[in-house]
From Swiss-Prot:
Keywords noted in UniProt: Amidation, Amphibian defense peptide, Cytolysis, Hemolysis, Immunity, Innate immunity, Secreted
Family (UniProt): Belongs to the frog skin active peptide (FSAP) family. Temporin subfamily.
Job of this protein: Has no antibacterial activity. Has hemolytic activity.
Keyword Magnesium part of the UniProt annotation: no
Lineage, broadest ranks: Eukaryota, Metazoa, Chordata, Craniata, Vertebrata
Gene Ontology CC annotations of this record: extracellular region
Main location: secreted
Descriptive protein name: Temporin-1Te
GO terms, biological process: innate immune response; killing of cells of another organism
Tissues expressed in: Expressed by the skin glands.
Keyword Nucleotide-binding: no
Length: 13
């Protein structure tokens, strides 16, 4: 899983 994907998910939360 790319770190950018995690950042996007965190932004939604």
């Amino acid at each position: 899983v790319l770190p950018i994907i995690g950042n996007l998910l965190n932004s939604l939360l």
